[in-house]
Regions:
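Intrinsically disordered or low-complexity boundary/linker segments at protein termini
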Residues: 1, 55-141, 145-148, 154-157, ...
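Soluble catalytic regions of membrane-associated enzymes that act on cell-envelope
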Residues: 2-42, 49-52, 56-65, 73
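Soluble or luminal CAZymes and related metallo-dependent hydrolases
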Residues: 12, 16, 115, 165
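Residue-identity detector for glutamine
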Residues: 12, 19-21, 32-34, 67, ...
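Well-ordered alpha-helical segments embedded in enzymatic catalytic cores
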Residues: 19, 44, 118-122
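Structural beta-alpha unit
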Residues: 25-57, 155-184
Length: 184
């Protein structure tokens, strides 16, 4: 938070962090939250993540105020440039209990990223806990690794593998998604 936040803003922040912990607990994920003051938001997040040895950072998607502004906003861009931890960007339009399908768009060579099996595990748990079908969209090699992982560790997950060429897949998906679908 910034130093100029009011006490009401701080209390609202604490309330939101508690809600985030409750949602994470429903997905069998331990979420450690922290409420701190910082003069620079991105530096505050960076320092807190190092102090607490955080493995993952979850941030909300910034909505641009002007066309000149970056899609991700200055705070997220700073984090992406300076952080060596997994960053999850969230823009929740529909509560998780109302999600109908989960779609996962996977970039080419994602299996070579250090956090590949970590996020695969997180998505699988979400599918198990919600009972929703997961649609994985990616390259054949990546999909085969995910399928092998699911067959070994998450046999109850409902899923479909959809091979893509990469490039225009997000555009196509954006036209097919419903308001109650989750896009990862």
């Amino acid at each position: 938070m910034y130093d100029n936040c009011s006490e009401a803003d701080r209390e609202q922040g604490k309330k939101l962090l508690l809600q985030a912990q409750e949602v994470a607990a429903k997905a069998d994920v331990t979420l450690q939250t922290q409420n701190r003051l910082a003069t620079n938001l991105s530096n505050g997040i960076l320092h807190a993540s190092k102090e607490n040895d955080a493995s993952e950072i979850i941030v909300g998607l910034h909505i641009r105020a002007t066309q000149d502004e970056s899609f991700f906003g200055p705070v997220l861009l700073n984090l992406l440039n300076k952080m060596d931890r997994q960053i999850m960007i969230l823009h929740a339009v529909t509560p998780i209990n109302r999600v109908h399908n989960i779609h996962v768009a996977i970039p080419e060579n994602a299996e070579y990223e250090a956090g590949f099996y970590r996020w695969t595990e997180r998505i699988a748990r979400m599918g198990e806990n919600t009972g929703r079908r997961i649609f994985y969209h990616g390259h054949a090699k990546t999909l085969s690794l995910i399928q092998a992982y699911l067959q070994r560790y998450h046999t109850s997950v409902l899923y479909e593998m959809q091979e893509t060429d990469g490039g225009n897949e997000l555009k196509r998906l954006s036209t097919e998604l419903q308001l109650d679908d989750l896009m990862v």
